[in-house]
Amino acid sequence: DWACHANDAAASIHDVLEMSNAVQAAVDFYNAHPNETLILVTADHETGGMAIGYKTTNYDTFLTNLAHQKMSYAKFDSTYVQGYIANKTPFETAMQDVKNVFGLTLPTDPAAASAGKLLLTDYEVENLRKAYERTLQVGSSSQSKMSQQDYELYGTYIPFSMAVCHTINHKSGMDHTT
């Protein structure tokens, strides 16, 4: 639920796969005890509006890009971003972590030639830089301290993490309606 709210496609996909595993365990139990087992699976709502196909990939998908993402946005926030905020970490240092955790690679990185579809464009770098600078300004403040533009770009989430998730989603040919 929270992964979809935050437009974190990779974490959402992992959640669905884990749900599938849980349902399979219930089906296996049912097969062993069919007369005394009822399986009921429900959801309260869909969040995020995940869509496959994105304009900058000509609506092709590159879902293998998502395999480079090693943790959810929430774990990235707590493991890395909170430290960036506290220490005013330089953008280039943060981007090394983004490369290690999400696979997104700066054009100036020595490994840029082998980054493939995860090589960032100048436009993407600028969007990430703006989101990072905004993150250092507002930290993990409440929405009341963020501008309307911040809200439209990042929702109620930390700008840098959302920009990273949006970027890997788009490079993978995915988007969200929220």
Each language-model region and where it sits:
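A post-motif C-terminal structural segment
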Residues: 1-178
